[in-house]
From Swiss-Prot:
The gene is rho. Disulfide bonds join 110-187. Glycans are attached at residues 2, 15, 200. It comes from Atherina boyeri (Big-scale sand smelt). The keyword Isomerase does not apply. GO terms for molecular function: 11-cis retinal binding; G protein-coupled photoreceptor activity. The record marks 113 as: Plays an important role in the conformation switch to the active conformation. This is Rhodopsin. PANTHER family: OPSIN.
């Protein structure tokens, strides 16, 4: 083994010189230059500085404007709630620990930070699954006369939290565990050890199969069918140009959200799987730290995509920020009318396959 295993931690360094210490009790400056912890803290501060306002604004604007409270937007709001959960439960913890150079908050803090990051990431993934299924059902119409309504959206939100909890809760009760990883100032699932009594191997296989591979397969299937349906409908000109444009805009927005999720989380998942399948192999602290903290940036992607690509929401947001007036009223209003992306309009006038 090319690391040092201790009670509830694994340091990616052999303790041949006796410098390795518990990441709950001592600064880990022997792993990397102390300046790296300052950079990490600054990065987390940036994510908090951007992530909190943009996700809070998404929630506030939707509550402020009744016309935005559509079934599809319930799922998008669920993403914002998950991101805020990560900001408060994970980012604030990590910025504090990185300032000290070790996980000063102890085992309880490690569980809170690891749970928050895992739950937020899983809610985001399963929300994208629900969005993909919604797009597939609305556009491809595998169920005739089906309309995605408020009850379906509420069930979809409840489903995302249930599935996310099924992944994030078990390590709190002994099926695997959360331990410090990388530079030892953030926590994640124990991919590193075969510690007795925790069944890490079975949990990691369960997590990768049921909470990563299967949801991604569902997403790819739905969008594969959706792309074919949109092309067929466009060729047959079965729907009006306005309807087709609205469908394309909503679909494009959700696809970009999926791509941004993959860009954020696949590097982390790939490195975690490599470490799990090569336990005991040599790797440095940055090997896991960089993809782990890159994945955390996903908390600012989805609301930015939503704001940039949903013209109606952007119009309402500007109105809210400018005290009820939109200085770009003519441009935003015209665009919003021409290509409305409300779920209600999407559901009632959807593109069907030829």
């Amino acid at each position: 083994m090319n690391g040092t295993e201790g009670p509830y931690f694994y340091i990616p360094m052999l303790n041949t010189t006796g410098v390795v210490r518990s990441p709950y009790e001592y600064p880990q400056y022997y792993l990397v230059n102390p300046a790296a912890y300052a950079v990490l803290g600054a990065y987390m501060f940036f994510l908090i500085l951007v992530g909190f306002p943009i996700n809070f604004l998404t929630l506030y604007v939707t509550i402020e404007h009744k016309k935005l409270r559509t079934p599809l937007n319930y799922i998008l709001l669920n993403l914002a709630v998950a991101d805020l959960f990560m900001v408060f439960g994970g980012f604030t913890t990590t910025i504090y620990t990185s300032m000290h150079g070790y996980f000063v908050l102890g085992r309880l803090g490690c569980n809170v930070e690891g749970f928050s990051a895992t739950l937020g990431g899983e809610i985001a993934l399963w929300s994208l699954v629900v969005l993909a299924i919604e797009r597939w059902v609305v556009v491809c119409k595998p169920i005739s006369n089906f309309r995605f309504g408020e009850n379906h959206a509420i069930m979809g939100v409840a489903f995302t939290w249930f599935m996310a909890a099924a992944c994030a809760v078990p390590p709190l009760f002994g099926w695997s565990r959360y331990i410090p990883e990388g530079m030892q100032c953030s926590c994640g699932i124990d991919y590193y050890t075969r510690a007795e009594g925790f069944n890490n191997e079975s949990f990691v296989i369960y997590m990768f199969t049921c909470h990563f591979c299967i949801p991604l397969m569902v997403v790819f299937f739905c969008y594969g069918r959706l792309v074919c349906a949109v092309k067929e409908a466009a060729a047959a000109q079965q729907e009006s140009e306005t309807t087709q444009r609205a469908e394309r805009e909503v679909t494009r927005m959700v696809i970009i959200m999926v791509v941004s999720f993959l860009v954020s989380w696949v590097p982390y998942a790939s490195v975690a799987w490599y470490i799990f399948t090569h336990q005991g192999s040599e790797f440095g602290p940055l090997f896991m730290t960089i993809p782990a903290f890159f994945a955390k940036s996903s908390s600012i992607y989805n609301p930015m995509i939503y704001i940039c690509m949903n013209k109606q929401f952007r119009h309402c947001m500007i109105t809210t920020l400018c005290c009820g007036k939109n200085p770009f009223e003519e441009e935003e209003g015209a665009s919003s009318t021409a290509s409305k992306t409300e779920a209600s309009s999407v559901s009632s006038s959807s593109v069907s396959p030829a």
